[in-house]
């Protein structure tokens, strides 16, 4: 049984089909690093993260944000099995990278804010509610290995 109704899946897939993954991915990861600066410790090899402007214009941040959102897109294709879809990434982030799983929730919330900014009135309360469920589900799936 899915955690999203058929209507919610339609809302998520409808909006996601319009998302520019390159742009939104870089912006979401950049905003995470600006708003939650302690997350920068996982990206020390990315070069200059000394200011909001440096972070938001950093090519490595943008490239990794794109990679993150491409994985998110793949997860949306397997929305009814997020734990399976993100099992390998959960293992990587837990066992090798030692990322605090709370960061997955933070990134999900930042992504929702970025989507709201990009889509304005189209990102109505129903769409937001559906995306909040999705990012919570993805965060839970990514944290699964930690349990």
Curated annotation (Swiss-Prot):
Involved in oxygen transport from the lung to the various peripheral tissues. GO terms for molecular function: haptoglobin binding; heme binding; hemoglobin alpha binding; metal ion binding; organic acid binding; oxygen binding; oxygen carrier activity; peroxidase activity. CDD domains: Hb-beta-like. GO terms for biological process: hydrogen peroxide catabolic process. Belongs to the globin family. Pfam families: Globin. This is Hemoglobin subunit beta-1. The modification N6-succinyllysine is found at residues 18, 60. In the cat family (felidae), the oxygen affinity of hemoglobin depends little or not at all on the association with diphosphoglycerate (DPG). It comes from Panthera tigris sumatrae. Heterotetramer of two alpha chains and two beta chains. The gene is HBB1.
């Amino acid at each position: 049984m899915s955690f999203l109704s058929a209507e919610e899946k339609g809302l998520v897939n409808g909006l996601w089909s319009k998302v520019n993954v390159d742009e939104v991915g870089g912006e979401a990861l950049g905003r995470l690093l600006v708003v939650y600066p302690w997350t920068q410790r996982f990206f020390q090899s990315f070069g200059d993260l000394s200011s909001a402007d440096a972070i938001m214009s950093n090519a490595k941040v943008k490239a990794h944000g794109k990679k993150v959102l491409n994985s998110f897109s793949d997860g949306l294709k397997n929305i009814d099995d997020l734990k399976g879809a993100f099992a390998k990434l959960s293992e990587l982030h837990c066992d090798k990278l030692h990322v605090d799983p709370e960061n997955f929730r933070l990134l999900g919330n930042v992504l929702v804010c970025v989507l709201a900014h990009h889509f304005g009135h189209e990102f109505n309360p129903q769409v937001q509610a559906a995306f909040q469920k999705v990012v919570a589900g993805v965060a839970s799936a990514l944290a699964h290995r930690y349990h």
